[in-house]
Amino acid sequence: MWVADMDFRTASAVTEALKKRVEHGIFGYVRVPDSYYHAVVHWFGRRHYWKIEREWIIYTTGVVPALSAIIKALTNPSDRVLVQTPVYNCFFSSIRNNGCEMISNPLIYEDNTYRIDFDDLEKKAADPKVKLLLLCNPHNPAGRVWSKQELIRIGEICLRNDVWVVSDEIHCELVFPGHTYTPFASLSEEFRMHSVTCTSPSKAFNLAGLQIANIISAAVSYTHLRA
């Protein structure tokens, strides 16, 4: 799951748009067009029933640099960050590079699947040094698509303990029939105002080389991330 290198060609609509850009012949500084933001808003609203605002979206070059910037904005050196191991290894370096301590909430492997140890999560989230949870939804590498009930329980624990949820949702389009991806921030106003979501078309649409990703948050602005 961690390698965004597909065995199929990128969609013709993408390759045709790239050809048009190449034919333009000038590759100086560019501004992200409004049409990009409208496409993101439309996609999540139509496909995932998540109503987001244009102002919530920050364009970025990748989810990994986005995670690092968010951790820097929401923590101080020596703060603690929760992760649900086993998990994408770049989570660890993003935490460490910001001078924070990684705290593991290990997933429980049982009956050929993984589940969250909520008792352990409750205990560790209560530590006042824990400032945020890096959530992977759907989870990489476990392959779990967290249910609404699981996400609500995570959110309630984090709200009670004033822990931010930073949700990496890059795999949201890679969901098998019979399972439903739910954006964490879509579940309540409280969750939306205490979370940051990271998305990208790179995994599902074979676009990793184009370096396109989004930070989506009603609570954290571009100004916060630059501070």
Go through the PLM ranges and name each one.
Residues 169:
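Walker B catalytic acidic pair
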Residues 187-222:
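Active-site PLP attachment segment
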